[in-house]
Amino acid sequence: MIRTWLSDIRPLYEEHRYRRYYDTLPAFRKEKADRLRFQKDRAQSAGAWILLEKIRKKYRITEKAAFNLSHSGDYVLCSVDMECNEQTQVGCDIETVKEADLKVAKRFFCPSEYEAILREDNQKLQRDMFYRFWVLKESFMKATREGMALDMSSFEIRLSSPPVL
C-alpha cells in the first residue's frame, strides 16, 4: 500500500527554524539544499526530506522502501510504499495551480487528454482538468524513474476511478 503525506513548509522560511532542521539533514541533502539560490527553494528541498524522515521514524519504515517526493509553493508531498516491496514503483507530484496553458496541453498531452480538457464548460474546469492530467502524468514519469526524459505523449491517462494508464 502506498500512502501519501502533505506538509506545509512555511515555518522553514524562518532562517532559525530552517537552520535547526538543516543541521539534521544528511550531507548529500545539505549539499543539494546549499546549491539552491532562494530560501524558499532550500526550504522545499529540506522540508521534503524532513517529512520523509518523520514518516520513516513514525512508521518504522526501512530505507529500502520506495518513496517519492514533490514540492510546489508552500507544500511538500511524500509518498511511501508501506510494505517495502522491492517491485513497487512510487511517483507523486504536487503543483501550485495557476492558469492552464492549453498550448502546453496540446503539445505535450495525448490528443484524448487535450480534448478532455477542451470539453470542460469553462476556464476554471479546464484549468482543473489540465492540472489533474499534469500531476498524474508527472507522477507516472517519476515512478518509472525516467522523469522528464519520458515523452508525456507516449502514454495516455484515462480518467476513471482510479485513473488508468
Please annotate each region the language model reported.
Residues M1-L165:
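Core catalytic alpha/beta fold that binds nucleotide/phospho-ligands
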